[in-house]
């Protein structure tokens, strides 16, 4: 079995984010599965960021709390740092390395300060490598220092025994759009790193103790699993963008906000997706334009985060009143207010269910990983048009800033089986046209703007079947029933796998773990091989699947696992069904849920604890 978790980090703006993609693609090239995650502070430059990449020969979508190997070019990443008031900003990552793991540091750092006698520590003279390359290219050192990220990846690959030619290929691929001079410089840095390490082979042999083999990473495994280019490096924010493209979305309208902006930037950088990107003056304008495009018959969407969701509430209610198909992706982050813009949380669930004033139909759905994000985002457009209502896809930073390998065939399969369903969108009607005609299924024929036989009115007021403002009591009752009467059909139409996922044998399990969204992959991995615990991942949050509720009620014992302080899904289930899940595992420190901390927490619940708060970094 191959199992390695790798970490690097440094100051934001120092180029370390390149190391995440470079190391990940290198591991993919040799046939391994990867899952990477990015943690960073909410400023542009100067604060600490770090990246974790897990490498395995099995499919993965989560990471553990500790790492096998860490490579840092700066002291702060290892020892931590304090702000000007003497408060701890972060505690450093020396503590995150497993016993007998490997830490690679700058030679300026005194090993004694690290305080770990149970790990292997190797020092590298980063400055000598950088200055040597700078001299070779006749450049000032300041122009080359950003290439320390190349040293981190190249040193890691060398210590793990990978062929250096593959590293060079990965560098060329990573910087393919850069000038050739940049590529040449980075390749030279990589080569100088290897030459530097070769001069210390005796020390390396004793330090690493054949580290590659200890992780199960052998040349035979590499050759067997080589992917020959059949794997895609998929980042979470790209998955929702690709889902929109598959659905035939033609407009992405957004206002910049972390972490949602990455999705729109990705779309803009990939015109082949066929989606026009527009950035108006405010979040209010964003959703008004999105709703208007959908009224005109164009599949349009927006993506935002919590503060943007708050500003968009009025337009969501307008879309609900006028039965306008609307797809909105909420990449959740730490809240309330500005909160923690670059940290993860699941604090928007109850808000999404009740966003805006009054009662109207809506669908809330939550993918659990990158692959589900593609498929469920695409389906959101079908749901929106089929049932003529707003659909909110609850993403989160835990997914949007995660990255994993995905086979090209998986993406192709999602695209091939996707069928556009525009519901009751018609091309022709006979006058007089009733846009809000009462029907048996509460869904009226809908037509694009511009048809001379289809004159209708859209207002924020209550209206009759033509759209005229109406305050007549009987009409009010019928219209309220119409807008809110679509849930039974939604629950009937959707397949079980679209609503929730079960893992394990719930009939024989002692505990059923209920979760949603970002923590799902970690929870599922945490119970692998444990027949005492089954997992229910709820994908369709609202309306709540009736079949899932029946399973919950029959389980011997249940626990909710969420990334918020109030167990919002638990609240939702209780308010709809009256069933109260008795146990909670919650994490709300802004950090990713790790599978090993879930495993430990489940053990504590099974021993009688009914509430466990996770605080892993």
Regions found by a protein language model. Name each.
Residues 226, 233-237, 385-617:
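Flexible, low-complexity linker and terminal segments
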Residues 120-149, 153-164, 168-190, 194, ...:
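Internal gly/pro-rich beta-alpha loop/helix module
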Residues 2-70, 247-282, 304, 514-515, ...:
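Anionic-ligand anchoring segments at beta-strand to alpha-helix junctions in alpha/beta enzyme folds, i.e.
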Residues 1-11, 21, 25, 30, ...:
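Thiamine diphosphate
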Residues 70-72, 343-390, 396, 417-428, ...:
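Conserved thiamine diphosphate
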